[in-house]
Structures are given as structure tokens and as C-alpha cells.
From Swiss-Prot:
It is found in: Cytoplasm. It comes from Shewanella sp. (strain MR-7). Tetramer of two alpha and two beta subunits. This is Phenylalanine--tRNA ligase alpha subunit. GO terms for molecular function: ATP binding; magnesium ion binding; phenylalanine-tRNA ligase activity; tRNA binding. Its EC number is 6.1.1.20. GO terms for biological process: phenylalanyl-tRNA aminoacylation. Binds 2 magnesium ions per tetramer. CDD domains: PheRS_alpha_core. Pfam families: Phe_tRNA-synt_N, tRNA-synt_2d. Mg(2+) binds at residue 252.
Length: 327
């Protein structure tokens, strides 16, 4: 028994002196392992009398528990000290501002298109899409644009061959819709269009939204009402709006629409008119029964006016300093 007591006392001292977890694990093996000192003491049971064995066995178990308890306490203490040292080394100043997440935003042109689609969607207009590579029938002929019209010139239009080109307006979508669907029709057709022009207010590629309504007894007063409401909704103010007589091959009568700018000058924002009877005939719609109105607007121009941008080219230069202003 004296030897067992000495082993326990020795183990407890060594455990207190251990400086790391590796040393504690070595102590555990030396005293409690299969070949450890406490395990060796159990082998002495064979030399004891039956009367002595119970007391000796109990003493060995108590010794094992004492050593194991001390090991557990010392391990917990070292782990706690290790964690505290780590936390001190990695101390965080909680008063510092957090790292912000850079959230993306819609491009201003996309925002404008969505705003237009939302307004006309509430009036029952559906959104239609069409090909950007267009044939001369859908881009010119069906729109009552004569063979010698300036819009067909090489310096205005990007041709692949005499019959195939990049579309110069989204009006071809209206033609394709009227070819496949019967009146009444209410559609808008947003999309990219292409013209051979590049300066402060023009780019070779830009976006248009064109609208078409075909039904019985459609008149110019309805067109004026729709566009007047749209412009007030888009610019979110009660603007002065005027309709100027103009000419477009595909509408008759035709008009250009201006709004009064903050500088006291009229600004052109879109074109419109009653669908020309020849356009209706080209797609098999009887102009004696049906009439309609159409309008078209440059998305970039509307965006420039809404946000006060002076150079249209800024929308396509992908300068984040510019684009982040529209989040």
C-alpha cells in the first residue's frame, strides 16, 4: 500500500509540473497505460491472500481515479490558458466599422427599360422580342419605307448583304407580331438597335422601346393620353408636354413629342403617330376595320434626361464610378 501511495504522490507532482498537453499524455501512458505503473501494481493481486485482495483492489482503483482526475483538471487548465493566450493575440477592436458588402445594382438603361415595361404592363401591353439581324421586308418594306428612303443608305445602316442587316429599329417586332396575331393588339418591343452614328448623343448600338396598339376605333386622342400619362409617370412630375407635327413613313398623321426642360427649353423625347394603312395592309389587317397607334423612344435619351447625364457614351464605358451613382 505504501508503494501505491508513493506512486500516486509522484504522479500528482509530475502532472502539476507538466507544461503542455503532450507531456500530460506521456504521463497518462506511464501511469495508466497497459504497461503503466498503476497497471503493474494490479499484477501484485496474485500474491495476496483472499482477505487482502478486496482492499488492495479498491486502493488501486482509487489511485487510478486520483491520477485521472488530476490529469483531466490539468488538461482543462492548459487548454483554457492556451485559448486565453490565443484570444489575446487575436484581439479584435469591436469599435472598428464592419466590412461592408459591395452590392451590385441595375444599369441605368436597364432601370429605364424596366420602368417603361412596368408602366405599359399596367395598361395591358405585353412585351415582345424579335431578331436583331433583320431582313429588308420587316425592317423597311412592311413599314412603308420606300426603296430610296435615306434610312436605307449604307452610311446609316449596317448591312450584311442587300437583303439582311442589323435592325435600325424594333418596329420589325411589331410587323412580326401582326403577322402571327390578330387584333386587338397591345405590345411594346424593347431591344437593341443599330445605326452608323457615333458622337456625344449617338452610339452605333443603342436601345429603343416601341409600342403598338391596334383595335377598332383607335384615335389620336387615345395616343396623346397614353403618352402624356407615361411621361408624367416616368419623370415623376407634372411636365409640360407638346405634340409637334412630323413625318414618319409608317405613321400618318405623325408627331414628335417634347417636354419642357428645367432650362425652359423644349426637349424631344419620342416619336409617334397613327399606324399607316399601308403598314396594316402589308400584314393582312383591314385598315377599313382596324386602326392603331405606334410610338418609339430612345431608352438612353430618356435615361439621360431622367438622371441629368450629358454624354450618352457614358452608359457604355463601364466606369464603376459612374454606374455606382445609380444604385
Amino acid at each position: 500500500m505504501q508503494q501505491l501511495t508513493e506512486i500516486v504522490e509522484q504522479a500528482l507532482v509530475i502532472i502539476d509540473q507538466a507544461s503542455d498537453l503532450k507531456a500530460l499524455d506521456d504521463i497518462r501512458v506511464d501511469y495508466l497505460g497497459k504497461k503503466g505503473k498503476i497497471t503493474d501494481m494490479m499484477k501484485m493481486m496474485g500474491s495476496l491472500s483472499p482477505e487482502e485482495k478486496p482492499a488492495f483492489g479498491q486502493a488501486v482503483n482509487d489511485a487510478k481515479q486520483a491520477i485521472q482526475q488530476k490529469l483531466t483538471e490539468r488538461i482543462d487548465g492548459l487548454k483554457s490558458a492556451e485559448l486565453e493566450a490565443k484570444l489575446i493575440a487575436e484581439k479584435i477592436d469591436v469599435t472598428l466599422p464592419g466590412r461592408t458588402i459591395d452590392i451590385g445594382g441595375l444599369h441605368p438603361v436597364t432601370r429605364t427599360i424596366e420602368r417603361i415595361e412596368t408602366f405599359f404592363g399596367e395598361l395591358g401591353f405585353s412585351v415582345k422580342q424579335g431578331p436583331e439581324i433583320e431582313d429588308d421586308f420587316h425592317n423597311f418594306d412592311a413599314l412603308n419605307i420606300s426603296e430610296h428612303h435615306p434610312a436605307r443608305a449604307d452610311h446609316d445602316t449596317f448591312y450584311f448583304n442587300p437583303k439582311l442587316m442589323l435592325r435600325t429599329q424594333t418596329s420589325g417586332v411589331q410587323i412580326r407580331t401582326m403577322e402571327t396575331e390578330k387584333p386587338p393588339l397591345r405590345i411594346i418591343s424593347p431591344g437593341r438597335v443599330y445605326r452608323n452614328d457615333y458622337d456625344q448623343t449617338h452610339t452605333p448600338m443603342f436601345h429603343q422601346v416601341e409600342g403598338l396598339l391596334v383595335d377598332e376605333n383607335v384615335n389620336f386622342a387615345e395616343l396623346k393620353g397614353v403618352l402624356h400619362d407615361f411621361l408624367r409617370n416616368f419623370f415623376e412630375e407634372d411636365l409640360q408636354v407638346r405634340f409637334r407635327p412630323s413625318y414618319f413613313p409608317f405613321t400618318e398623321p405623325s408627331a414628335e413629342v417634347d417636354v419642357m426642360g428645367k432650362n425652359g427649353k423644349w426637349l424631344e423625347v419620342l416619336g409617334c403617330g397613327m399606324v399607316h394603312p399601308n403598314v396594316l395592309r402589308s400584314v393582312g389587317i383591314d385598315p377599313e376595320k382596324y386602326s392603331g397607334f405606334a410610338f418609339g423612344m430612345g431608352v438612353e435619351r430618356l435615361t439621360m434626361l431622367r438622371y441629368g447625364v450629358n454624354d450618352l457614351r457614358a452608359f457604355f464605358e463601364n466606369d464603376l464610378r459612374f454606374l455606382k451613382q445609380f444604385k
